[in-house]
């Protein structure tokens, strides 16, 4: 038996010894009993046990879910590669377990419907149609859009507006993919890298033109609404009149009748999220009553001073990598801790009233800087074209962060209510809970250096427990998470949450 004195164990130890000294005569036998009793007292007290209660109070209702960016591999043909049928089946198996609340799927028209001035809806469409068929069959909502016009010269051209909306109508009404519920006309229009170059007035006018064109296709606006403004938190283009909260506020003032979903992008730092500063920042965004706000892209970047060591390691790996030149890559996304950080980010979003988030991104094989696969944008949970592009099948295996994100996506499903967790404030812990159809999930991340013991009050019937702990993440033959305990019932549960670990309890299917 090990004996540990927790935070309050020292005080307990002193009280017991004081009592014993006053209660026993000073002889040798009693001194022996004194030692035994003190050891037992210390052993029983163990670490401080935190009492946690998952209440019935709803933080936000009908959560839209945790999802991913899953673009249709439309750059792969230019690399001389394509996703094989076997690889598609692997992808479907993994995403089936993930059960994303929604998918953000962005395309480049130059890779699909537009070729040197010619509009062809069928061109290179196979991968997009396969992806959308999967989402349609599973009832997964899709936020679809275009990164930019297929040629920058078309940015204000009615020809692009007509082509883009015609293609959308073809997908939704002719092909039947009404899983597409929202449409983004520009990716990150506030950016100096984007076609609008931060010009809110231009973007606003294009939103109005796209909406008018959608209205010319009978029935389309009944199925699809515009989403926006799709801007980046903590970025301010000097050429723009607004920062990200300003873009959202102005969009609400000018275009609310056109916008069905508000979305923004977030790439916070590790220290920023773990300290709670990012959660506070989310409170700066205000949207009209009855509308929802999601993080359409989310991940981590380490440019802030507090994350300098992480940035240095990211740069070192990028320089040494044979798969990227470092253009817009998160080289630490394969590290175990990144899975913890994604979970913490999701908890901040859920507890903060934001309606959902999509992690950027599902697969390393989605995008490259330029036209070469030797400069991939590495952000994904795997590279499904690892063998085809680099002769390395091992690149196609899931990275550790997929394990945690699969749990956070599957067990905080679309439509669930996010519940308040009553717990004492403890540094290094983050928690979230949800309920759907009378079944519950409770998840806790311990990013401290010490194990934590929780006495968690949450009713479960036939529940399971998963653990995301480095070196101890059980999987099945497909590399998918397997619970460490099953058949969990009752109203109170003792949980040991390892240092640098995630524990999830659920009786959801």
Segments and roles (model prediction):
Residues 95-269:
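Substrate-binding cleft and catalytic face of glycoside hydrolase catalytic domains
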Residues 37-45:
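Hydrophobic h-region of N-terminal signal peptides that target proteins for export
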Residues 44-84:
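Mature N-terminal, pre-catalytic/accessory segment of carbohydrate-active enzymes
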Residues 424-461, 468-471, 500-504:
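Carbohydrate-binding surface patches
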Residues 483-509:
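C-terminal beta-strand-rich structural cap/linker in extracellular carbohydrate-active enzymes
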Residues 303-406, 417-429:
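Aromatic/acidic polysaccharide-binding cleft in carbohydrate-active enzymes
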Residues 4-5, 9, 19:
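N-terminal amphipathic/hydrophobic targeting modules at extreme N-termini
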Residues 200-345, 352:
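Noncatalytic carbohydrate-binding groove/subsite architecture in carbohydrate-active enzymes
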